[in-house]
Amino acid sequence: MATFAKPENALKRAEELITVGQKQEALQALHDLITSRRYRAWQKTLERIMFKYVELCVDMRRGRFAKDGLIQYRIVCQQVNINSLEEVIKHFMHLATERAELARNQAQALEEALDVEDLEADKRPEDLMLSYVSGEKGKDRSDRELVTPWFKFLWETYRTVLEILRNNSRLEALYAMTAHRAFQFCKQYKRTTEFRRLCEIIRNHLANLNKYRDQRDRPDLSAPESLQLYLDTRFEQLKVATELGLWQEAFRSIEDIYGLMCMVKKTPKASLMVVYYGKLTEIFWMSSNHLYHAYAWLKLFSLQKSFNKNLSQKDLQLIASSVVLAALSVPPYDQSYGASHLELENEKERSLRVANLIGFEVEPKAENRVALSRSSLLSELVSKGVMSCVTQEVKDLYHLLENEFLPLDLALKVQPVLSKISKLGGKLSSVSSVPEVQLSQYVPALEKLATLRLLQQVSQVYQTIQIDNISKMIPFFDFTVIEKISVDAVRRNFLAIKVDHMKGLSSLVNRVLRRKDSGIICLFLAESLSKARTMIYPPAKKAAKLGEALSNLAEIVEKEHKRLLARKSIIEKRKEEQERLLLEMERVEETKRRDVQKMTEEAEQKRIAAEYEQRRNQRILKEIEDRELEEAQALLHEAEKRSKRKKKPVLEGEKMTKKVIMELALNEQLRERQEMEKKLLKFAKSMDHLERAKREEAAPLIESAFKQRLAEEAALHEREQQQEIELSRQRHAGDLEEKRRLARMLENKRILQEKVVSSREAEFTRMKRERQERISQIIQSRKQEREARRKMIFFLRSEEERQKRLQEEEEARKREEAERRKKEEAERQAKLDEIAEKQRRRMLELEEKEKREREEILRKSTAVLPKPAEPPTLGRPAELGGAAPIPAAAATAPTPGPGKYVPKHLRTKMDGAGQAPPPETDKWGGGSKPDDRPSWRDERKPPSFGSGSRTSWPASRR
């Protein structure tokens, strides 16, 4: 490490090293001087040294050296002359930018220069080999070799300057200027990665500034000038992010602006808020978040209408139309339908966060938060009078989509309105943040909304509809796109649609009818099913309560016993579970106690280690202070030894602090410097008198020597002039002799020249004639090729048209055949339906007739005999038509009692007594034939269960 008595010596030494080409040694010498503790008092020489230092750092691309030097120089200049640091930093950035631009221009010039030896060759062999080996083009190689290192150094320069100026309240303007230049660098050269890092760096600087706001020399954000600088930086960051297409970084910049305003509790000016909401509209549109996009447009409209006095009526109409179209572009269903609870919570938090950004409340209150929705947005548009400012086309579109009920021709009426709206828009003359408004960007979203509205209205009118009819009613999209839109709407619970591609039908469900009338329909269905069950299974008569209780007593006792056993087992299981839980709780408590004990021991060990580390740090700091004090005292003693004064300052031992000793040493150095300047001034004065005396004595001697020198030089000039004239005469005579000698060959030279010229003219004429013949041949051949190609193209087009015509004829024939088959199938199905309907009516008539006959028979039988208590038990022979065996005791029974079985022979006796015997009924309730033997046809006939049953009979049975 070189030691210099004065800073000027170091600068002089560095210049000498630069002259001989040793720039590294010169940089190291200046670096040692700047980082030395001997030169901590600012002086003008240090500024010149820093200028030279940064020039060397830029020339050699030593960013680390530059950062160390600027940090040390900041320490020197912070309290004395901060403007010097500003000048050095500006010079540093200017040099880095200039060298980067120079390298870029050199790369472009190298790429555009014509540096080839053979103009007919495309590339040199070595260029081809290099391109095949490296795999990159010439411009890529030149950029990598020339431009990229300087761009890296320029980026490192910006980072270094921002790091140095981040906590300096006196250089806030320079910090903002550096940030703006870094943004422009990223924008000019499309450096997206560096832009993200730069935004993160600035964001961290603001966080640290807010965290350590009580430190000295920190910027005060409550000051209007500081706040304006920081806001301008954030808005420039927002603009560059949108121009680079970094929408996520642009949204983070919006959050940075909002966080900065919440930090200082102050709302920015209206001009800045216009830029804020203008960029918000772009961000939300690129993220396909139409709801927030519409709210941002509404805020922008309110600001422009309130604060922009130069806003023309046309511009206001365009902005209002954009607000209404953005609101209509919002999907009419809930996007979060069907999401999980965690997703709903996250969406709620995100919506509240975005609502704060759009509302821009620097002190948001929880009770004032309102969730954003499409319905509230549309009502707000009407209440704020936005609809009165829009164009007539937008009003018509709003009326069609929100108020009209046109289930068949809604899309057809919307289409011409959208075509007119797509042509509206243009540049705005008085809105700087939104220079241009194009309403055509909302047309796709509005077409989707018109499709949803049409499907919603059609579902309220029709249950099924043909897919072809839907495609005709919606001219915007193909049916595949319509199907995707419908699937999304069904998933969001907006529509209920089923599509059958085999039948070409679409089933629609009216969600309003299903919600309101579903309970009534279910009630009617339940009553009908209950009646049908009662007719099929009629309820039996209830027995006595005591008999029922006695008959079910054993079952009840068994059930009660099982229930008690189950309850006992449940109680036992609960006891075991309780014991297990108690054991588990004891084990958990023991584990917790051990963990707490372990944490206590670890905390004690950490406390002991921290105390030991603190004592060690204090000891190291004390040793450092003692060493610095000793160095200061040694410096003071050395200064006293150099001093010639007899009276020396008395050291007070431990009472003398380092600051006092440094002040004494600096005062001593200042006194020595002043004495040295006085001595130099006295010596210069004496040297001035001596020099003047010497010049007065030497003046006459110099004059006489000058006159003598003039005479000598005049004689010498005359002599040299005569010699030159003689030499010129000799050269002229020799030239004349040479001319006479060469004049004899002049005729031969002329003959040779004519011969060469004639031969070359003949050769040129021959080559010109051959070239004309070759060109005519080429023209003829190309003409023939074009003719052949034209004929081939005509033939191919004719063939394609013929094939296409044949294909269309074949498709038409197939289509006619399909329509004919469909028509025949429909006619055949109609005939079959008619035949089935006639059969059903005939069966209903037969069943109704049988029912009437059966009721008539039952009515007659109940009028003659009382109904038996128990149904008769019929054996297998009776079921097959044979007579049951008659017991002997029954023959002598005079009159059957009520509830007894009456055989056939007794019924004849009763008939003789004057009573009409009732017809015998089987277990199905049907009457038998006179001979009590049902035929084979009656045995095969299934029973009828009343009018509600429907029986299908074969055609042969009917």
Swiss-Prot record:
Residues 804-958 are annotated as: Disordered. GO terms for molecular function: mRNA binding; translation initiation factor activity. Residues 93-123, 548-696, 796-861 form a coiled coil. Keywords: Coiled coil, Cytoplasm, Initiation factor, Protein biosynthesis, RNA-binding. Residues 946-958 have a biased composition (Polar residues). Residues 316-513 form the PCI domain. Residues 877-894 have a biased composition (Low complexity). Component of the eukaryotic translation initiation factor 3 (eIF-3) complex. Belongs to the eIF-3 subunit A family. RNA-binding component of the eukaryotic translation initiation factor 3 (eIF-3) complex, which is involved in protein synthesis of a specialized repertoire of mRNAs and, together with other initiation factors, stimulates binding of mRNA and methionyl-tRNAi to the 40S ribosome. The eIF-3 complex specifically targets and initiates translation of a subset of mRNAs involved in cell proliferation. This is Eukaryotic translation initiation factor 3 subunit A. It comes from Nicotiana tabacum (Common tobacco). The gene is TIF3A1.
